From Swiss-Prot:
Protein's name in the database: D-alanine--D-alanine ligase
Native species: Verminephrobacter eiseniae (strain EF01-2)
Cofactor binding, note field: Binds 2 magnesium or manganese ions per subunit.
EC number(s) from the headed UniProt entry: 6.3.2.4
UniProt-listed PROSITE patterns: ATP_GRASP (PS50975), DALA_DALA_LIGASE_1 (PS00843), DALA_DALA_LIGASE_2 (PS00844)
Length: 331
């Protein structure tokens, strides 16, 4: 498969801002992602500059002549459509999904509703507003149960609840990060992740090789995701070829159902009892650190980190073509 144009000239892409940092709970990871992307783009002759959205005025991007933005922000106010909307108003092309798809993908409840409406498998869930409601959800969904913020990533604020007396503290932890708290049926089995790369406006998205994740005691938390060497990543996944293709198609369908573009990473559980895959969430601005999964999957497909970053940047675009809104206003 050809996922990269070897003749792409990084110097032709103009002045580029790598948006990183931000104000979400994932700021630390975003800074690591942004630093890696910045090095990669500069290695491909791109005129790239770091831009911490927590410290800079986005309006400066227009004033200082930036042509494109690589979004290396994670979580709220970076991956949820807010920055994308600002860049739409500024008329500056950006990487990844547009305003609506970004917003829906970060909101786990909304993405699960859309997937369910499309007939795509996702664990049962309940949206709760108190510890008492979380306890009621446990009775319905069964133990163990996952309690997490509806609009955060990197397993921040997530708890695995086994007993009713744990529900109140699990709810309070999740509510520290988001007033919308999601209780989700726990799926026992292997955790998989699948990167999806857009092939351009006239071609379909394509899944890269799956990664099977084996964390100590099955606990793939924030520390194990980004800073631990104890987690084991299997790529190739070791699954039968036909099963891997089917799960890749599921990730592509999840990507399409939300209207994503550019790239994303779908997180999937493979139920041990019957090998049924379940969609957990999709990340529209995935991590790009040295522990991150997208670069690992890309390498398995023959795409280097530097070439991946350059390809994503070259695909930067806008929901609304430049001049379309001003033309409508004149009409």
């Amino acid at each position: 498969m050809s996922l990269f144009d070897p003749h792409l000239d990084g110097a032709s892409l103009g002045k580029v801002a790598v948006l990183m940092g931000g104000v979400s709970a994932e700021r630390e990871v975003s800074l690591l992602s942004g630093a890696g992307v910045l090095r990669a783009l500069r290695a491909r002759a791109v005129d790239a500059h770091a831009f911490d959205t927590a410290q800079g005025d986005l309006g400066a991007l227009k004033r200082e002549g930036y042509a494109r933005c690589f979004i290396a922000l994670h979580g709220r106010h970076g991956e949820d459509g807010t920055v994308q909307g600002a860049l739409e108003l500024l008329g500056i092309a950006y990487t990844g999904s547009g305003v609506m798809a970004s917003s829906m993908a970060l909101d786990k409840t909304m993405s699960k509703r859309i997937w369910r409406s499309e007939g795509l498998p996702t664990p049962d869930w309940r949206l709760v507003t108190s510890g008492a409601e979380a306890g009621q959800a446990l009775q319905t969904l069964g133990a163990p149960m996952i309690v997490k913020p509806a609009r955060e990533g990197s397993t921040i604020g997530l708890s695995k609840v086994h007993q009713a007396q744990q529900c109140a503290s699990a709810y309070l932890l999740a509510a520290r990060y988001d007033p919308e708290v999601l209780c989700e049926q726990f799926i026992a089995g292997d955790e998989l992740t699948c990167t999806v790369l857009d092939q351009g406006r006239r071609a379909s998205a394509q899944a890269l090789p799956l990664i099977r994740i084996v964390a100590p005691d099955g606990n793939y938390d924030y520390q194990h995701k980004y800073f631990s060497d104890a987690t084991r990543y299997h790529c190739p996944s070791g699954l039968p070829e036909a099963q891997e293709r089917a799960i890749g198609r599921l990730a592509e369908q999840a990507f399409s159902a939300l209207g994503c573009r550019g790239w994303a990473r779908a997180d999937i559980m493979l139920r041990a009892s019957d090998q049924q895959p379940f969609l957990l969430e999709i990340n529209t601005a995935p991590g790009m650190t040295d522990h991150s999964l997208v670069p690992m999957s890309a390498r398995a497909a023959g795409i280097s980190y530097e070439d991946l970053c350059l390809r994503l940047l070259a695909m930067a675009t806008l929901d609304t073509p430049p001049g379309a809104l001003s033309g409508a206003a004149r009409a």
